[in-house]
Every structure is written in C-alpha cells, then in structure tokens.
Amino acid sequence: MKQFKLISDYKPSGDQGEAIKALSDGIIAGDKFQTLKGVTGSGKTFTMANIIQAVQKPTLIISHNKTLAAQLYREFKTFFPENAVEYFVSYYDYYQPEAYVPARDLYIEKDASINDEIDRLRLSATFSLMERRDVIVVSTVSCIYGLGLPESWRDLRITIEKGENIEIEKLKKQLISLQYERNDAVLERGRFRVKGDVMEIFPAYMEDAYRLEFDWEEIVRIRKFNPISGEVIQEYEELSIYPAKHFVMPEDAIPNALERIKKELEERLNVLNKEGKLLEAERLKTRTEYDIEMLSEMGYCPGIENYSAPIANRKPGEPPATLFHYFPDDFLLFMDESHVTFPQVGAMYEGDRSRKQNLVDFGFRLPCALDNRPLKIDEFEKMLNQAVFVSATPGPKEIKYSTRIVEQVIRPTGLLDPIIEIHKSEGQMEHIYGEVKKRIALNERSLILTLTKKMAEDLTDYLTGLGLKVKYIHSEVETIERVEILKGLRAGEFDVLIGINLLREGIDLPEVSFIGILDADKIGFLRSTTSLIQIVGRAARNENGKVVMYADRISDAMKETIEETNRRRAIQEAYNKEHGITPKTIKKAIEDILTRENEIKKEAALAEAGPLINSLNILNPADRKKLIKKLEAQMAEYADMLMFEEAAVIRDKIEEVKRIGS
C-alpha cells in the first residue's frame, strides 16, 4: 500500500515541530477534535502536511472559498507529488438555482454553466478514494452537498481484463449505461469510440484514455495513451472504468423509485386539492408526470437530483450521500480558517431549505426535493471521524469541542506582529494622510478599513484630493476584479486601498506596512476580537508593520487584540534573540491564482499561435491538424494548473481553427 511521502527542502522550525508532534500524537491516541491555533505566516500548511505524513490517513481539507482551496491544492500537490492530491469544489462557472418568488408570482428556472475541467477533478477525487488510501482532497463546502451513492458508483464500474472474452457490442452497452457517449469522430472526456477491432475509452475522471485491442471477442491488449499526442504511456493486465457521472442509477432501482414518486405525487395532490390549491395541483401533476415518463424511458430527467431521495431509497429527512461517504471510516479532516468555515457549513442548510420550500408549497416540486440538500450542521459533525481545526482565531465551537489546542506563534522568518497604536477619532483624516505619506517614502502600501460605504467614499475623495493614489473596494466588485485590485496594490499602481471588509481574500500582502482601522471601538462583527486579530495579521508580513486603531475609547475587543498581539510579539522576539534572527519583509512574487511563470507561458503560447491562426486560410489540412494538437496540449496544461480562464481562451482558438477549416 502506497504511503504518504512529504517532499520538501524545508524542515520544521520554530514551534512547528512541537505542534506536529502534539497533534499527531492526539490523532494516533484517538482524539476526535483538536485545534491548531497558528498565527499568519507561521507555516500552518507545512504543519498540516507533516501531520498527514505522520498519521498516514486519507485526508479531507475544507476551505471557505475556491481561491484559498486552489492555493492549498497547489501547495499540497507540491508537498506530495507521489500521492493523490485532489480538488473538489463546485463545478458551476455560473449557477442560478430554481426558485419561485410568491410576491411577484415569478418562477425562475435553473440555469447553470458547468466547468468541464472542475467536473473532471471532482470525479477524479472520488475515483482516487475508490482505488487507494494515499489521498488528500482539498474542498470547499461543496463537500456537504448531495452526491451520488458511492455504492452505486463503485458497483456499476466495469472491470476489464486482458485475455477476457467479451463482445464489443456488450461492452458498448455497458459504457452507455454508465453515461458514456459514443463518438467515433472525436475522443473526448466521458466518450468512447470503436474502429474495427479497437475500442478507445476516455474516462470522465482522467486526462489520459485507454485503448483496448480485440482479436474477435478476446481482449489481447490494454494500453493507456495520451489522447492528444497518441503517445502510449503504460500497458495493463486489467483496469476498472467508473461511471461518467456521480448520479447514476442501477436499472433495478428505477421501478422502486418510480413507485415512490407516483405515491408521493398522489399524496401531495390530495393535500393541495383539499387546500383549494387547484392551480398548484395541476402544475405539480403535469411537471411530475413528465419527469416520471422521462425516468421510465431514459433513466434520466432534467432536475433528477430533486428525486435523489426516492432513487437512493432514502427515508424523508435522511441526510444525502456526500463526498464524506466516499472516504474510509478512519479519514482525517482539516478545517482551514475554521472561524469562517464552520459557521459557513452551518448556514448552508437553512438557505437551501427556504428556497426549496417555496417550490414545494406552490406546486413546482414534490416534498422529496427538500431532501436534495446540504448536510445540516449536526449531520456534518456526526460525519467527522477526527478533525483538526486550523485558525489564527478559532471560534467558540472549535475551542469547546477540542481536547487540545496547540499554538503555533513563531514565524520561521522572524517577522513580528505589528506595533499597535491608538489614536482619537478627532483629526484621524490628517493622521492617516501623514502615516500613508511615510509608507510611500518607503515604497510600502497602506490599508484603511472603515465601517460604512459613505466613510470609505469620503476618505477616498479626501486622500485623492491630496494627491495620493487611492482605490476603494466594495461588495459589488466581482472576485476577479478584487484580485486584480490587490495585485495592483502590491505592484505599486496605487498606494492606499480602502474598504469595509478586506479579510475575505486570504491573500498575502507583504508590501502592506500600515493599517488604519476607523471606528475600532464600535461593537459588531467587523470590530470583534476575531476580526481585529485577523486585520492586524495583515501587517505581519512586513518588518515595518504598524496598525493604528482610531477610537475614542478602548473596547474589550481592542484590549484583547492588543494583549494577544503583544504576547505573540514577546514570544517571537525571544525566539529571534535566541537564534540571532533579524526580521525581514517577505519577498514574494506578485501573483494571484496564476504564477508569473504561467503568465509568461500563456503569453508565449498565444504569441506563437496568433500568427498561425491569423493566416489559417493559407494553412493546409495537415498544418491545421498540427496546430490543433499543439493548442490542445497547451489547453490541457493550463487546465492542469487550474488556469481555467486561460484554458477557455485556447479552447475558443481551437474552435476558431476548426470552424475555418471546415
């Protein structure tokens, strides 16, 4: 059995070693819940990686947004290149859920755009969990949403052996039942093709395809190959092909599911008719009977997930199968930034329920649609075998549950938590201007946090009027634009960023050495102890880090934040003195999800492809074919690196080449 093998040039330092040992010992001893309370920049991810190697358990890591999940995924791929590191997030590029707004009598149909590469990565995660134990899955709260039954997904797989006798026609039917499509012209993910005595299958969860060679009905050769270049990668004696979708239904489950749906429809129609809701009853009857017919004939219907409970033979109210059900019982969970992630998990069910309740009440869906849902918080907690909560500011639930809380407050870089000063609100604008000017002289940046949009706008106008380069970030700014603004701040395109909540990015800003917190003494979640400590941590990447709290009194949250920050500074200073470390600002390349190296590759690829594409009309068919192969390889490389927007650009170029050549 393959073991987790951590590969890194670094060794644990500071208090990482103590944290790794304490938490690993706790896991081995059977402790259910523990907390790693680690400051910003202390190397919490590296500590997590060392724990995984020490305990050798299949691991799920949950983050609270896709951006941070992608960062963690890349880091763990680097730490464990010989093991299965997978990525499981929502596969929707765009998602408008089905909904009904009674006040406006407005029904909104479900509308979604699925990201093909993320769909592959999700399937790859469950495939790895079925086939091996050395698996790390990095996920968002997508892991608490309903997924197909793991038993069905596993039991429906096709096992193919060299020397086996099987009719090609029979194998074709088996693949179609697993929701693979036949396409003899183009071999793409989730498809297969047959040419003479050769069948090629492109599993929905892989980047490579399989080629089966037959001698009459005997399989004489099984090979894996690159579907773009055609290069043979490996020969096999046997292999398994898993379904192309997570939601699959064994044939023998269909009759029972249909009976349950029909019975529920009859019961629900009786209720609606008794209540005098004749329009709702007729609407529900028409919609559901159409779905029943589709399920009966095709084994599928639009919105099939709304019938997941009868299909899976679940009782009303029973939790759905989720990614957790694909893990073995002894799995380990890390909840990153748990002070945000834990409450987020708890909020998912209620939001989903309120939307679907309207659909049921007004005759758009059967009550079983309510069981196509995320896990409730108590169901989620029951699913956890052993968990480590990771945060600089763990919440009350983590602290209450944990049998041990392990601190990690020493930064190997020697950087100290910033100095905190308090300044009265009177004259705060002038004081901020003076502090920002000092930072500009040092080629450093500033963050200013306000409580209201009006204050942010006024401060932006004031500082801009004094000749400073300022930008204001607000809730209506899209995620991609937010990342671009943060990159601009780091690159020095402007000097000051003003906003209400600048915590949610989770992106390092080592150039920021000054943070001004307006209305620091106000009561509320934006000025709680947790929020203030997180804000202060933003300036902990710079050797000149300084935070000024503008307030007319010292609130309890301010007092606790200052005391905790001073405690951490003292520990770090003692460590630095003992080891002769002089703190230096972290030097980090300016990047978002993409590294600059990848940007250069992208620019080079587009520059190289551009002239060819522009002169397509003079290219002969052979040259066009070569160009398409080259572009497909580039597209696959971007997708590999989670550079989905760049992959989409190349995909569009490929379509352009094919269109002109047709």
UniProtKB/Swiss-Prot annotation:
Gene3D superfamilies recorded: P-loop containing nucleotide triphosphate hydrolases, UVR domain
Cross-referenced CDD domains: DEXHc_UvrB, SF2_C_UvrB
Record bears the keyword ATP-binding: yes
Helicase C-terminal domain: residues covered: 428-594
A GO CC term attached to the entry: excinuclease repair complex
Binding positions (ATP): 38-45
Chain location of the short sequence motif Beta-hairpin per the record: 91-114
InterPro entries associated with the record: Helicase/UvrB_N, Helicase_ATP-bd, Helicase_C-like, P-loop_NTPase, UVR_dom, UVR_dom_sf, UvrB, UvrB_inter
Compartments, record wording: Cytoplasm
A molecular function GO annotation: DNA binding
Chief location category: cytoplasm
Helicase ATP-binding domain boundaries: 25-411
Xref: NCBIfam families: PRK05298.1, uvrb
Role: The UvrABC repair system catalyzes the recognition and processing of DNA lesions. A damage recognition complex composed of 2 UvrA and 2 UvrB subunits scans DNA for abnormalities. Upon binding of the UvrA(2)B(2) complex to a putative damaged site, the DNA wraps around one UvrB monomer. DNA wrap is dependent on ATP binding by UvrB and probably causes local melting of the DNA helix, facilitating insertion of UvrB beta-hairpin between the DNA strands. Then UvrB probes one DNA strand for the presence of a lesion.
Subunit structure: Forms a heterotetramer with UvrA during the search for lesions. Interacts with UvrC in an incision complex.
Homology family: Belongs to the UvrB family.
Protein name (record): UvrABC system protein B
The species this protein was found in: Treponema denticola (strain ATCC 35405 / DSM 14222 / CIP 103919 / JCM 8153 / KCTC 15104)
Gene: uvrB
